[in-house]
Regions:
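Ligand-binding loop in jelly-roll beta-barrel domains
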Residues: 83-105
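A generic "binding-loop/recognition-motif" signal
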Residues: 41, 50, 69, 85, ...
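Short strand-coil-strand connectors
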Residues: 28, 65-69
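Short, conserved beta-strand element in jelly-roll/cupin
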Residues: 47-64
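A cytosolic small-molecule/anion-sensing beta-strand core signal
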Residues: 58-59, 74-75, 93
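Short acidic-glycine-tyrosine-enriched beta hairpin
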Residues: 68-83
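A short, N-terminal "cap"/entry segment at the start of jelly-roll beta-barrel domains
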Residues: 1-39, 44-45
Length: 105
């Protein structure tokens, strides 16, 4: 069920209290994924053939690696992962990240 609004701080507090890593919340037809990335965490290579993904750092530092470049994002910064781009995320010190993904059409 689409909630219409999301309190990111409250969701991250809830994840921490439950020692959970992530949750997905539907919002206006967009899947909003909130992820707590542990220090030293390194994601697997991934790509999305049907959607872009916007990555927003809520806290900490998060690196988005592409095959041809690397972006270091800090609190309040974001980037867009284009359709089909291979990428993965890493964080040497830990981060809280919000991912927005909508399939076109």
């Amino acid at each position: 069920m689409d909630q219409g609004q999301v309190d990111f701080a409250a969701v991250f507090d809830d994840l921490a209290a439950r020692d959970a890593r992530e949750t997905t919340v539907p919002l206006g037809g967009v899947d909003v994924r909130l992820v707590r990335v542990p220090g030293g965490g390194e994601g697997r290579w991934d790509s999305h053939d049907d959607s872009t993904e916007t990555v927003v750092v809520w806290s900490g530092e998060f690196t988005v690696e592409f095959r041809d470049r690397t972006l270091l994002l800090t609190k309040g910064q974001c980037c867009v992962v284009p359709v089909g781009a291979e990428h993965r995320g890493t964080s040497p010190t830990g981060a809280e990240v919000v991912l927005f993904r909508k399939t076109p059409g």
